Regions:
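Catalytic zinc-binding patch centered on the HExxH motif and its immediate surroundings
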Residues: 3-16, 21-46, 55
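Short pre-active-site segment immediately N-terminal to the catalytic Zn-binding motif
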Residues: 43-64, 79-80
Length: 107
């Protein structure tokens, strides 16, 4: 099994969620040591290069990107309650990330 792209290359610079453009960027760090942050109305996802004093690995950055996408999807469908349920978002993200990486490893 092989991967043609590195994991960090899988993170796009821009996505759309519910027809809204979302800019994606990797920043040095985020307040409070978060790995990532997103804002649907603000149209952005920010992924920290360093979180809580540690450099995030590429796999962690990909997981953070998907995690923030899940938050945005829930907010977009009007379910902020689901977006605020961090345990649900983490569980969903873990499964989605594993599926994506499994698909990539088969190509």
């Amino acid at each position: 099994m092989k991967q043609n792209k590195s994991l960090i290359d899988l993170i796009p610079n821009k996505i759309q969620v519910g027809g809204q453009d979302i800019d994606v960027s990797i920043v040095d760090s985020i307040e409070d040591g978060y790995c990532g942050i997103s804002q649907l109305c603000g149209g952005y996802i920010k992924i920290a290069d360093k979180a809580n004093g540690y450099i995030q690995s590429d796999s962690s950055k990909l997981n953070t990107f998907i995690h923030e996408c899940v938050h945005l999807i829930f907010r977009n469908i009007g379910r902020s309650d689901l977006s605020d349920d961090e345990a649900l978002v983490v569980a969903f993200t873990g499964s989605a990330t594993e599926i994506i990486r499994s698909i990539l490893n088969q190509k």
